[in-house]
């Protein structure tokens, strides 16, 4: 097996046992990036020099007999909406194209302390607004399984980098499905933790009540390993939960016999691709054979999650993105004759079409006369969506649904119809609205394209999701498949 396709656990074990060096793994990964990146375009910035320096530091620590950390020598990609001191952080937008932050996000600090090796910053839909990575200012990222298709979004670069062997694990952010949907399209594991479980300090805000950082990995074990590193209370994030966080790896080999899994009838609807439906049915059979018990549940307000999301998220975005005005940092139009013209021209030239669409929509929803009719009503329905989940969890331990209605779609297929694009996140949005954890797990193929299922858990019960996902993974072979590049 090529070094870049080893799991994070295998890499740390081999490096600590001195079977391989961190520098060897880093070189193999950067060589892989050089070889396949022209096809995939997962990265906005590749940090080869920094990565090799970090790898050398791991090897030096081991030589001195020091503990190199739980991610010793593991190549990690970081979505380009997380602050990295001294490394360009663009959000794939013209407005931040040359922005170099002076500080690290909390998750980035934690990765450094854990001995990770940074491969670079990955491409995304501009300001994380999109479902296909076609909204990037720079270029679209391609799906490693089919270069004519999207990798999903908004964390498409992170998902594609892990699937293509350009990183071993990666960080993404998930506001309405932006980790789980690209993980499904690229055939890897993607976990959105409970809101508040991972610090948002240093994550460029899109919708602050929905955003959450989480891991991409090729195995459930690697996702648990990365979650161990990034989860935890952070006083710099006022929404960070001050609770005891478990060792997520300790859940992996637990028995799932007798676990009750709910199947929400509102998620098994017309419009689901036949290949996705078959993969879900097969996954249910595997979990039943391991002793899990299934029952139908109802989440009646699910049907409102799309309109609720597209009122709340743009409303928060319109407020958060007001800071990009050309005054303090980022792009500025120097041709303007006065400050008002400078504001308007900077924003008109700096933001792409989808970002402008959402700023307009959010500003409208928050404006006088419409605030109560739209935004306030959406907040009330959000509460009803959350209460549906609370009721379901009195009967079952977790829920199983499709992650996406279809496998990855072709470039340009949905760009002219925003609502059709938004519908690709129809099964993931409610999880963000309710602040719950969700994981996308590879469940097979529809032709040559990966398909997945989603597990949704109670707040801060990532352990149960990881336990069930790992049990499924250990009894199937889907996670071992690799794209031919």
Swiss-Prot record:
EC annotation from Swiss-Prot or TrEMBL: 6.3.5.7
Enzyme class: ligase
Gene Ontology CC annotation, any one: glutamyl-tRNA(Gln) amidotransferase complex
Molecular-function GO term, any one: ATP binding
This protein's UniProt keywords: ATP-binding, Ligase, Nucleotide-binding, Protein biosynthesis
Active site: 79, 154, 178
InterPro entries for this protein: Amidase, Amidase_CS, Amidase_dom, AS_sf, GatA
Enzymatic reactions: L-glutamyl-tRNA(Gln) + L-glutamine + ATP + H2O = L-glutaminyl-tRNA(Gln) + L-glutamate + ADP + phosphate + H(+)
SUPFAM superfamilies in the cross-refs: Amidase signature (AS) enzymes
GO process annotations (BP): translation
Subunit structure of this chain's protein: Heterotrimer of A, B and C subunits.
Family: Belongs to the amidase family. GatA subfamily.
NCBIfam families: gatA
Function: Allows the formation of correctly charged Gln-tRNA(Gln) through the transamidation of misacylated Glu-tRNA(Gln) in organisms which lack glutaminyl-tRNA synthetase. The reaction takes place in the presence of glutamine and ATP through an activated gamma-phospho-Glu-tRNA(Gln).
Protein's name in the database: Glutamyl-tRNA(Gln) amidotransferase subunit A
Lineage: Bacteria, Bacillati, Bacillota, Clostridia, Thermoanaerobacterales
